[in-house]
Amino acid sequence: MTQALPDSFVRPAIISDVPFLGDMHATTMKATLAAALGHDLPAEVSAQLTSEALAKGWSDSISAPPSPAYRTLTAVEGAAIVGFAAIAPADQAMIGDAEDNPGTIEILALEVPRNNGRKGHGSRLLAAIAEFAEQDKAEEMQVWIMVGDEAKTRFFQGAGFAPRGIQRNLDLGTGTVTEQCWYTVLDPAE
């Protein structure tokens, strides 16, 4: 006899999700930064990336987003929160004039901890993001990926994203990590 899998879905994040988002974000961010550096994070950087500090930011984002175009989503399996994503209008200064890049949605975060990976949660989050981008009449989606984050690079490349040709560096005290901007053009509504 086989056991049915619990329901998996994506929904808008709610305030009671905040502690989970803070924990998840701290864990995934520390791991990604350490991998990009090739060594442990400097103590002062690690001390800033606490679950509590990140949860405060997510609480503000959920309870008082700057506009309706800012969204935070939660992936749920059964009753457990297993991932999250956040989107906002892209910073036009990074991608050029608005008339050259109308309606670009930036994926600020799309995180599924390794222990919940490979179950479709990331794909469900990305599909929900694409639906919101379509509602907002966006023509592109973009995301910043740290050089060396092969899993995230493969995920977004497999979803049709490609390098935009823009990068930025983050100084972490004992080293610098580089992020590359990846993007995809959305199919026009029929």
What residue ranges belong to the model's regions?
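Conserved beta-strand-loop-alpha-helix junction that forms the acyl-donor binding cleft
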Residues: 143-153, 171-173
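Conserved acetyl-CoA-binding loop of GNAT-fold acetyltransferases
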Residues: 156-166
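Structural motif
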Residues: 24, 136, 158-159
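Active-site acidic-Proline motif in GNAT/NAT acetyltransferases
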Residues: 113-115, 119, 147-148
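Conserved GNAT acetyl-CoA-binding A-motif
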Residues: 133-145
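Hydrophobic pocket/interface hotspot
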Residues: 21
